[in-house]
Amino acid sequence: MKFPLLFISLALAAFLTRVQDADSSVISKEKSVRDGEEFPCAGTMADCRGLADNSVCCDTGKCIGEVCYY
């Protein structure tokens, strides 16, 4: 009776470890995508206050009023 219980416990531990590893890699991929969406202008000029309309902002965006649309 001890052998099947030990085998099942080890199999369950291995399965849970693989699920946890896969889950953390999915979370890190989702986080990198989300960070890119939340901060698309990181390191670039994104403030349009005082600039003329259609000025370039966020590398590929355009200023309209005080807002950068990209």
Swiss-Prot record:
A GO CC term attached to the entry: extracellular region
Disulfide bonds: C41-C58, C48-C63, C57-C68
Keywords: Disulfide bond, Knottin, Neurotoxin, Secreted, Signal, Toxin
Keyword flag DNA damage: no
Tissue and organ expression note: Expressed by the venom duct.
Compartments (UniProt record): Secreted
Propeptide: 22-33
Signal sequence range: 1-21
GO MF annotations in UniProt: toxin activity
Domain of life: Eukaryota
Entry text on domains: The presence of a 'disulfide through disulfide knot' structurally defines this protein as a knottin.
Protein name: Conotoxin Cl6.13
